[in-house]
């Protein structure tokens, strides 16, 4: 952002596959932040997003419309969206002019849900990179639907997608398991919740997959994928129920720590509070245990016994 005298701005780039709850997250997080006294500006970067439930400070639809692109260039939804993001990348002066008057706000960027934008296409990464040069410190908040935990094969896929996104986007990163209140609506978890949030020994997942005749044929492939995930050892998740204020607060603490907002000058903080943010909350077993008791049905037998029966 222009001007040497301007202060650093902070925000979140909310990404994730379609249906993961990005727009709902932006609504809930913006309301929570305003309740804390922060000035919030929600920026819609998804040209396919219509009927937004939140007050939108900047809307990319004012620059380029997905339906217009599809009609004029004879593109499908995915191709049209990629073109829109490339068009935004080529017209970043428009975005900068929209964001400059909002200096002093905390930004929430509601991003498109096409996975390829966050795994290998360069437009969104280039946009984020340019924002950092405007002295806008972002944390990528990557949402995935928590019900994928109920299917070992899908969970491995989610881990691969999350890892690819972390490596491609090149921002401080927080992964969220969204819709925690619905986690067992599609099936029972094979392991305790902390197994999925901390991404513990994935060999247990391979054993679980081996019990399925279909996936037994792909054991070597799954072993290589698991080895790749564990070699990087980057992926972990924070559980989120956007209707639960305590859950939102845990997410916000992680985001503020990732982008440095907790050390900013906008709010007066004591040294004790700063040190607490710097060294605390990494070992959140107790909070994860509380979430398990809150959202998961109790198991009739310990996890170790369940694993031995696989």
Curated annotation (Swiss-Prot):
Protein's job: Small GTPase required for proper localization of RNA polymerase II and III (RNAPII and RNAPIII). May act at an RNAP assembly step prior to nuclear import.
Signal peptide: none
Gene3D superfamilies named in the record: P-loop containing nucleotide triphosphate hydrolases
Protein family per UniProt: Belongs to the GPN-loop GTPase family.
Protein name: GPN-loop GTPase 2
UniProt binding sites for GTP: 19-24, 178-181
Pfam families per the UniProt record, alphabetical: ATP_bind_1
Complex formation: Heterodimers with GPN1 or GPN3. Binds to RNA polymerase II (RNAPII).
Gene: GPN2
């Amino acid at each position: 952002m222009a001007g040497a005298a301007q202060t650093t701005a902070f925000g979140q780039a909310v990404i994730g596959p379609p249906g993961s709850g990005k727009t709902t997250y932006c609504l809930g997080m913006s309301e929570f932040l305003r309740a804390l006294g922060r000035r919030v500006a929600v920026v819609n970067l998804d040209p396919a997003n219509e009927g937004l439930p939140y007050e939108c400070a900047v809307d990319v639809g004012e620059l380029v419309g997905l339906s217009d692109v599809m009609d004029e260039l004879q593109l499908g939804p995915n191709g049209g969206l990629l073109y829109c993001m490339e068009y935004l990348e080529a017209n970043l002066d428009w975005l900068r002019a929209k964001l400059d008057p909002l200096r002093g706000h905390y930004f929430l960027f509601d991003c498109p849900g096409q996975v390829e934008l966050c795994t290998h296409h360069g437009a969104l990464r280039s946009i984020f990179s340019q924002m950092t040069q405007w002295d806008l410190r972002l944390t990528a908040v990557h949402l995935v639907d928590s019900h994928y935990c109920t299917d070992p094969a899908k969970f491995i896929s989610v881990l691969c997608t999350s890892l690819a996104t972390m490596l491609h986007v090149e921002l401080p990163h927080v992964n969220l398991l969204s819709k925690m209140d619905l986690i067992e609506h599609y099936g029972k978890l094979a392991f305790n919740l902390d197994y999925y949030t901390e991404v513990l020994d994935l060999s247990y997942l391979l054993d679980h997959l081996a019990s399925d005749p279909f996936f037994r044929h792909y054991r070597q492939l799954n072993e290589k994928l698991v080895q790749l995930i564990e070699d990087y050892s980057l992926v972990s998740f924070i559980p989120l129920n956007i209707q639960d204020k305590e859950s939102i607060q845990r997410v916000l603490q992680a985001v503020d720590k990732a982008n440095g907002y907790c050390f900013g000058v906008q709010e007066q903080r004591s040294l004790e509070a700063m040190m607490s943010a710097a060294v605390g909350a990494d070992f959140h077993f107790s909070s994860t245990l509380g979430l398990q008791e809150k959202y998961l049905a109790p198991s009739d037998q310990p996890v170790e016994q369940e694993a031995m029966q696989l």
